[in-house]
Amino acid sequence: MSETLMEQCRLREQHKRRNACIAAIVTVVLVLAVAGGVWWTAGDGSALVRNMFKPKATPATQPVVNSTAAFAYRTAPEFLAMETGDRDTGNVNYSPASMWMALAIAAQGANGTTRSQLNELLGSGSLADSDYQSLLSSINGQYSGAKSEMSAANSLWIDNDYSLASDYQSTVKKMFEAEVTTLPFDDQAAAKMSDWIAKHTNGSLKPKITLRDREVLSIINTVYADGRWKDPFEEQSTGNGTFHGEAGDAQVPMMHRTFSQMAYGHDEYNTWQRVEIPFDNGGNLAIVLPAEGHFDELAGDAEKLSWAFGTCSTASLGEGAMGCAADSMPGWGVSVNSVMVNVTLPRFTIDSMFDSEATIKAFEKLGVTDAFSAGDADFTKMIDTGSHGENLYIGSILQGTRIEVNEAGAKAMSFTKVGADSVSAPVDNVEFTVDRPFLYSYVTPDGIPLFIGAVRNLGGVGGEN
């Protein structure tokens, strides 16, 4: 992953103007969702033990929830349509929360039009320092009585020939609790960055990092979440069933469970249905099942995607239910109820790698252009250039992810690398059978989408799964 990113960075050096290359490993996200009992991670230590030493979680403010959710739905159609190298299945796993945090950290060092374009995309122009801080407090806190765990960490690494601007350093420490390390950018620095990532993902992720010429800064963000199903699927209830994928039918393991009370929603024309499979901390894995012939219509339209995933569902479950990312959205004839639901859901695994060039083009399409231009980018608030006289710009953005969903839960990890060169009530019992292409979102208790994905093919049809 890192070599691909740095090659992108090297290509940017062909510009006539001399530009510093900031290779920013901006996001490493690991989400582990399992059910019941004490579950030990690959890196040793249990979530229960770690949770004992955490402060009580406090909710993220509504402004930052709204900003991250809006960014997720606005950008998701671009990423869900990308070729990600997942063995040609067409399946995609995207982490909008990772991308948001990465770009938000970079935006603090931007000025002028570069900053305003990033703020517009992120929805962060009116956010206060306390809003950013609340996001970390929500993710890093302990939820009473829950075995689920989430954590986020940030760090900035700068070559010792350079120095962070003092105001920028103060800002990222205050708002993102970022660690700052100054060191020679050599192989030892790369190894230390990899070790830091492993430490903050509980040993579960340790990417190989290669530092190339002209890199002067790396930004690393990790997010870890171990969400336990509130009501786990039973392995003995799993049996083979047919998944009608875009590329053809396949026999795949189908999990089954009856939920006595579950948030279930659909639109008035039944072009989609949604269930929210809860974790024990108030978060959930939302599954949106488009009607036949409506998958592309939904996955490719930001407003419709937001409508399907963002419709407030907690109102019908009582005031004690947590979070609602888009409670001010129009209902558009949507019915949301708490009912008994028989869920049939396939096990699946997705590996995604988002091409840097395609990612940059997507953001340019969404209005962020100056940040990627050697001539127009303004990141003068990020470093003290001193005698270097170099201009900085974002030369590459790379995100790699993995998600596994089975009887135990949803286990996912993502790796984002940003390189900067220089209506009617349903029946009482609902059958929700996911046997055709579907969409999903891993949502925090506050309603922040950590992952949004699309499953188009399973069982080796269109590729391995």
What function would you assign to each model-found segment?
Residues 290-337:
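Internal alpha/beta scaffold segment
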Residues 262-265, 296-301, 424-425, 461-465:
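A short, polar/proline- and glycine-enriched secondary-structure boundary/capping micro-motif
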Residues 112-118, 294-298, 352-355, 413-414, ...:
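Extracytoplasmic/secreted cell-surface and envelope-processing proteins
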Residues 219, 271-290, 425-465:
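Extended hydrophobic
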Residues 65-77, 410-429, 463-465:
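Short, positively charged
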Residues 89, 130-291, 326-424:
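Non-catalytic, conformational "gating/processing" segments within enzyme and secreted inhibitor domains
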Residues 2-9, 20-185:
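Detector for small/aliphatic-rich hydrophobic stretches
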Residues 118-122, 233-242, 296-308:
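Short Gly/aromatic-enriched secondary-structure transition segments
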